[in-house]
C-alpha cells in the first residue's frame, strides 16, 4: 500500500463511518480496487480501520464518556449513559459475534444485506412523511426518554452492522429515528457507541488477520481517518440540530437506500 492509497482509505473511513452507508463496504471496495486484496482481507481491513472512528468519538464526545465514568460513582445522568452502553453492548455482543463468524465463513452474504438497508431507509422516509402530515410532537424524544427496551433494540440493530453492506451508524440512527428521537439525539446516541463497537471490530480483525492489517501504511490511513472523522461528526451534528426534522429524516433515509442499492448492485 502506498501513501496515496492510505490517504484514500483514511478519507473513505472518516466520512462513511458517520453516514448511513457502510464504511466496511466502502473500504472493502477501495481495498479490492486499489490493492487487489482478497474479500476476506478487505473485510478485516475495513473492520480494523474502525479504530480511527473510535479515537474520533472518544475525543469529540469526551464529556459524555466522563459522565459515564461518573456513573460508576452514582451520578444520575452518568448512570443513565452507563446503563445505555452496557445494555446495547450486551445485545450487540450476543448477536454480533455469531454473525461475524458467519460472515467470515460465508463471505459475502450477497444482496440481502443491501435490501435490509433499503427497507430501513424507506421506513425512515415514510416515518418522516407521517410526522410532517400529523404535525405531532412525535420525534422529539431526548436521551432522557430512553428506556431499557429501546436500548436493547439499538444494541440488536448495531449487531447487524458486522455484516458487509450494513452501516452501523445508519442502522442505529435509523432505529432511534423510528423510535421517535430527535435527529440530533439520534446521531449523538449512535455515535457515542462507536468506541465499544469499533474496538470490538478492530480486535476481531486483528485476531483474524494479525500483521496483514496492522502495517505502517494502515496506521497512516487510520490517522487520516481520525482527522476526517472529527470534521464529519461536527458537520453532521450541526445539520441534525437544525429545525428541519423532516428533512434530516429524509436525507438519512435516502442515504440508507442509496447504500443498500449500491450493495445490491455490487453483489449482482
UniProtKB/Swiss-Prot annotation:
<keyword id="KW-0378">Hydrolase</keyword>
<feature type="transmembrane region" description="Helical">
    <location>
        <begin position="41"/>
        <end position="61"/>
    </location>
</feature>
<comment type="function">
    <text>Catalyzes the dephosphorylation of undecaprenyl diphosphate (UPP).</text>
</comment>
<feature type="transmembrane region" description="Helical">
    <location>
        <begin position="245"/>
        <end position="265"/>
    </location>
</feature>
<keyword id="KW-1133">Transmembrane helix</keyword>
<feature type="transmembrane region" description="Helical">
    <location>
        <begin position="191"/>
        <end position="211"/>
    </location>
</feature>
<dbReference type="GO" id="GO:0050380">
    <property type="term" value="F:undecaprenyl-diphosphatase activity"/>
</dbReference>
<dbReference type="Pfam" id="PF02673">
    <property type="entry name" value="BacA"/>
</dbReference>
<comment type="similarity">
    <text>Belongs to the UppP family.</text>
</comment>
<feature type="transmembrane region" description="Helical">
    <location>
        <begin position="106"/>
        <end position="126"/>
    </location>
</feature>
<keyword id="KW-1003">Cell membrane</keyword>
<dbReference type="GO" id="GO:0005886">
    <property type="term" value="C:plasma membrane"/>
</dbReference>
<dbReference type="InterPro" id="IPR003824">
    <property type="entry name" value="UppP"/>
</dbReference>
<feature type="transmembrane region" description="Helical">
    <location>
        <begin position="213"/>
        <end position="233"/>
    </location>
</feature>
<protein>
    <recommendedName>
        <fullName>Undecaprenyl-diphosphatase</fullName>
        <ecNumber>3.6.1.27</ecNumber>
    </recommendedName>
</protein>
<feature type="transmembrane region" description="Helical">
    <location>
        <begin position="81"/>
        <end position="101"/>
    </location>
</feature>
<keyword id="KW-0812">Transmembrane</keyword>
<feature type="transmembrane region" description="Helical">
    <location>
        <begin position="146"/>
        <end position="166"/>
    </location>
</feature>
<keyword id="KW-0472">Membrane</keyword>
